[in-house]
């Protein structure tokens, strides 16, 4: 049976030790491993002792990796597991490490959800559905997700959502109906619920002055008509142009009037 002949502190890490058996280096061990097994010089080790030492030290390596990983920011269980797997920690040890992290409150999904909620509300233009997706992707339990999504909806000021919508509106040009559609689509993509969007839309003035709309119609008409002329005859080009402009949200009568004004249609 092997005998402990030397235990020395590692030069680069004062909390790890080199374990020598029968005069030869056997392995590096964590200070907690040293204490747990009460290792000392001249100690005789059973074969089962070595297996237990190796398994425990592997677990302690996982714990130290997890603590270091969690020291930079809050993490979820899924994130910690993925990190440990990348660092070659065995699956049975990973579960023990996760249990330790929960016990010491290093992993706390409610705290994580609360922190992410506050960060997103105050620093992003995203709605509760994007928040929901993030929590789901991070492996948060469904019950916690539902609880904190509801809190997100209640705590996000409607005025903030209105500001987001107004910013989007200013970047869009075209008929009122089309601008409303684009703003709605943008808010949906940002994770806002349709009910919230409806409230926001009722608070915004989408009206544009006639001169601006007339200029936009003229610009789009020329662009669309010239494109259609390369594909169709004159009559069909006019029909296709009217259809395209109506899809853009322009009023039929205004389109006809602009066509006549441009000398394209005299009907």
UniProtKB/Swiss-Prot annotation:
Main localization, broad class: cytoplasm
Keywords, sorted A to Z: Cytoplasm
Protein's UniProt keywords contain ATP-binding: no
Family annotation (Gene3D superfamilies): Winged helix-like DNA-binding domain superfamily/Winged helix DNA-binding domain
Domain of life from the UniProt record: Bacteria
GO cellular component assignments: cytoplasm
A Pfam family per the record: RecX_HTH3
Annotated localization: Cytoplasm
GO biological process: regulation of DNA repair
Its job: Modulates RecA activity.
Stated family: Belongs to the RecX family.
Name of the protein: Regulatory protein RecX
């Amino acid at each position: 049976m092997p005998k402990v002949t030397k235990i020395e502190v590692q030069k680069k890490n004062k909390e790890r030790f080199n374990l020598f058996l029968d005069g030869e280096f056997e392995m590096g061990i964590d200070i907690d491993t040293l204490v747990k097994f009460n290792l000392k010089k001249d100690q005789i080790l059973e074969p089962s002792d070595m297996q237990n030492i190796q398994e425990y030290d592997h677990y302690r390596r996982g714990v130290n990796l997890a603590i270091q990983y969690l020291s930079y920011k809050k993490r979820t269980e899924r994130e910690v597991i993925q990190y440990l797997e990348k660092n070659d920690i065995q699956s049975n040890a990973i579960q023990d490490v996760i249990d330790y992290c929960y016990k010491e409150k290093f992993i706390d999904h409610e705290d994580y959800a609360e922190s992410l909620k506050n960060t997103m509300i105050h620093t992003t233009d995203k709605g509760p559905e994007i928040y929901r997706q993030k929590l789901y992707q991070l492996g948060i339990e469904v019950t916690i997700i539902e609880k904190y999504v509801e809190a997100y909806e209640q705590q996000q000021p409607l005025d903030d959502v209105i500001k987001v919508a107004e910013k989007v509106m200013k970047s869009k040009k075209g008929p009122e109906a089309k601008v409303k559609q684009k703003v709605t689509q943008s808010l949906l993509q940002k994770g806002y619920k349709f009910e919230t969007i409806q409230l926001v839309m009722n608070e915004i003035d989408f009206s544009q002055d006639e001169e601006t709309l007339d200029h936009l119609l003229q610009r789009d008409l020329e662009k669309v008509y010239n494109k259609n002329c390369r594909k169709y005859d004159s009559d069909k080009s006019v029909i296709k142009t009217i259809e395209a402009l109506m899809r853009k949200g322009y009023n039929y009568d205004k389109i006809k009037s602009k066509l006549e004004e441009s000398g394209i249609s005299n009907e």
